[in-house]
Amino acid sequence: MGETLGDSPIDPESDSFTDTLSANISQEMTMVDTEMPFWPTNFGISSVDLSVMEDHSHSFDIKPFTTVDFSSISTPHYEDIPFTRTDPVVADYKYDLKLQEYQSAIKVEPASPPYYSEKTQLYNKPHEEPSNSLMAIECRVCGDKASGFHYGVHACEGCKGFFRRTIRLKLIYDRCDLNCRIHKKSRNKCQYCRFQKCLAVGMSHNAIRFGRMPQAEKEKLLAEISSDIDQLNPESADLRALAKHLYDSYIKSFPLTKAKARAILTGKTTDKSPFVIYDMNSLMMGEDKIKFKHITPLQEQSKEVAIRIFQGCQFRSVEAVQEITEYAKSIPGFVNLDLNDQVTLLKYGVHEIIYTMLASLMNKDGVLISEGQGFMTREFLKSLRKPFGDFMEPKFEFAVKFNALELDDSDLAIFIAVIILSGDRPGLLNVKPIEDIQDNLLQALELQLKLNHPESSQLFAKLLQKMTDLRQIVTEHVQLLQVIKKTETDMSLHPLLQEIYKDLY
């Protein structure tokens, strides 16, 4: 979860984000030299050396896109703001009492990590009973939605009950020679023909097996469906191969996946539960208990909490840019685009992807921090003084709606690739090859959702609508940064982020 994705740091002599990113892409190098915990590591309880962010001469003085001088950044002096620390024994007792109120806050629906089955060429979830979201198998008798594997075949509840009653009560129906068609709406009209259909498809009292579809049966049916799709559309095999490639790259590029985050939130992991931060005292306790990869100087620890949280977000954003850049390079065709277009696509896409993946770490009550070691409550973040208390609320509102789509990591891998390859970004030089790549990605995404969520016929359209929502969130975020620029004169924005936000919406 904390693997390093690159060994080449940002060149302090680099003139700009453009130069840095261009060199990064063309030389297959990463943008910052640091270990890669996933968003939002150190969020709110930063132990990062953030001195690079503190130069007053750079305080929201956003220079032209090609003129940031990294070598000019120095460490300013900040007046210490002492914290009053609660007695450890009293604090622990109060924390234990308060923690009980928040235990339910970090419970969400489980989501196991998807895996790729060579047999089926599809993404499935191991060690779980298949849910409705995985498969929509028809009843072999009437064509209604099967509820599971009953009496040796896949059958709906109605036909299962009909067959059981017929066998147990030894019912004999009046003979019918019309060979009536049995379907969902007509199945109750002719009991004789319905029973004959049950026998014809293989239902037997010697094969009494209730419950949901076994994994082996599901894989067999998935393989049959996949084969049928390939026969109808040979391109689907290529699209599924693309989906697998993107998923593999996604797993390598992003250390904390949605599946891992959900396992932490639901207690489905061998690691200890995350430390809950819900007020100032628990925040200070968390700083003592949570292990950080970066050590914050003592003078940084005395700063106002809201500022430290904001700066922790900045540091993590810079790391996230590296992860996203690494992933973008794995998208087939991306590195062959015009180098300036690659930079433009990342400039406009990185924050939309950050907020997409941040949703995986959230539920309606809070967000995982520091690689899942901590859980910071939504109410605590909202309680920070304005304008800092307004930063995360739109992200929570988006996350609740986005998580309702029940996407897994294999879905997200394609979706974020679609976001990156958006041909309508301002300033692109050669749009057609970008649109060609995105069109292929959209086809892969549509097929992926049909196979992975067959019961959600509108999911593809709903997901594309989220792209519009993400742009609005980024726009509002930039506007909030402008407010901070005016009200927080001693605050600074990381130079890399300055250039990304420059002329952004």
Swiss-Prot record:
<dbReference type="GO" id="GO:0070412">
    <property type="term" value="F:R-SMAD binding"/>
</dbReference>
<keyword id="KW-0550">Obesity</keyword>
<dbReference type="InterPro" id="IPR050234">
    <property type="entry name" value="Nuclear_hormone_rcpt_NR1"/>
</dbReference>
<dbReference type="InterPro" id="IPR003077">
    <property type="entry name" value="PPAR-gamma"/>
</dbReference>
<feature type="binding site">
    <location>
        <position position="351"/>
    </location>
    <ligand>
        <name>rosiglitazone</name>
    </ligand>
</feature>
<dbReference type="GO" id="GO:0045600">
    <property type="term" value="P:positive regulation of fat cell differentiation"/>
</dbReference>
<dbReference type="GO" id="GO:0006631">
    <property type="term" value="P:fatty acid metabolic process"/>
</dbReference>
<feature type="region of interest" description="Interaction with FAM120B">
    <location>
        <begin position="205"/>
        <end position="280"/>
    </location>
</feature>
<dbReference type="GO" id="GO:0009755">
    <property type="term" value="P:hormone-mediated signaling pathway"/>
</dbReference>
<dbReference type="GO" id="GO:2001235">
    <property type="term" value="P:positive regulation of apoptotic signaling pathway"/>
</dbReference>
<dbReference type="GO" id="GO:0001221">
    <property type="term" value="F:transcription coregulator binding"/>
</dbReference>
<dbReference type="GO" id="GO:0003677">
    <property type="term" value="F:DNA binding"/>
</dbReference>
<dbReference type="GO" id="GO:1905461">
    <property type="term" value="P:positive regulation of vascular associated smooth muscle cell apoptotic process"/>
</dbReference>
<dbReference type="GO" id="GO:1903845">
    <property type="term" value="P:negative regulation of cellular response to transforming growth factor beta stimulus"/>
</dbReference>
<dbReference type="GO" id="GO:0051393">
    <property type="term" value="F:alpha-actinin binding"/>
</dbReference>
<dbReference type="GO" id="GO:0048662">
    <property type="term" value="P:negative regulation of smooth muscle cell proliferation"/>
</dbReference>
<dbReference type="GO" id="GO:0032869">
    <property type="term" value="P:cellular response to insulin stimulus"/>
</dbReference>
<dbReference type="GO" id="GO:0030855">
    <property type="term" value="P:epithelial cell differentiation"/>
</dbReference>
<comment type="similarity">
    <text>Belongs to the nuclear hormone receptor family. NR1 subfamily.</text>
</comment>
<dbReference type="GO" id="GO:1905599">
    <property type="term" value="P:positive regulation of low-density lipoprotein receptor activity"/>
</dbReference>
<dbReference type="GO" id="GO:1901202">
    <property type="term" value="P:negative regulation of extracellular matrix assembly"/>
</dbReference>
<dbReference type="GO" id="GO:0010888">
    <property type="term" value="P:negative regulation of lipid storage"/>
</dbReference>
<dbReference type="GO" id="GO:0140297">
    <property type="term" value="F:DNA-binding transcription factor binding"/>
</dbReference>
<feature type="modified residue" description="Phosphoserine">
    <location>
        <position position="112"/>
    </location>
</feature>
<dbReference type="GO" id="GO:0008270">
    <property type="term" value="F:zinc ion binding"/>
</dbReference>
<keyword id="KW-0225">Disease variant</keyword>
<dbReference type="GO" id="GO:0000981">
    <property type="term" value="F:DNA-binding transcription factor activity, RNA polymerase II-specific"/>
</dbReference>
<dbReference type="GO" id="GO:0010875">
    <property type="term" value="P:positive regulation of cholesterol efflux"/>
</dbReference>
<dbReference type="GO" id="GO:0060392">
    <property type="term" value="P:negative regulation of SMAD protein signal transduction"/>
</dbReference>
<dbReference type="GO" id="GO:0005829">
    <property type="term" value="C:cytosol"/>
</dbReference>
<dbReference type="GO" id="GO:0004955">
    <property type="term" value="F:prostaglandin receptor activity"/>
</dbReference>
<keyword id="KW-0219">Diabetes mellitus</keyword>
<dbReference type="GO" id="GO:0042593">
    <property type="term" value="P:glucose homeostasis"/>
</dbReference>
<feature type="zinc finger region" description="NR C4-type">
    <location>
        <begin position="176"/>
        <end position="198"/>
    </location>
</feature>
<dbReference type="GO" id="GO:0071404">
    <property type="term" value="P:cellular response to low-density lipoprotein particle stimulus"/>
</dbReference>
<dbReference type="GO" id="GO:0016525">
    <property type="term" value="P:negative regulation of angiogenesis"/>
</dbReference>
<dbReference type="InterPro" id="IPR022590">
    <property type="entry name" value="PPARgamma_N"/>
</dbReference>
<dbReference type="GO" id="GO:0043409">
    <property type="term" value="P:negative regulation of MAPK cascade"/>
</dbReference>
<dbReference type="GO" id="GO:0045923">
    <property type="term" value="P:positive regulation of fatty acid metabolic process"/>
</dbReference>
<dbReference type="GO" id="GO:0050728">
    <property type="term" value="P:negative regulation of inflammatory response"/>
</dbReference>
<dbReference type="GO" id="GO:0035357">
    <property type="term" value="P:peroxisome proliferator activated receptor signaling pathway"/>
</dbReference>
<dbReference type="GO" id="GO:0010745">
    <property type="term" value="P:negative regulation of macrophage derived foam cell differentiation"/>
</dbReference>
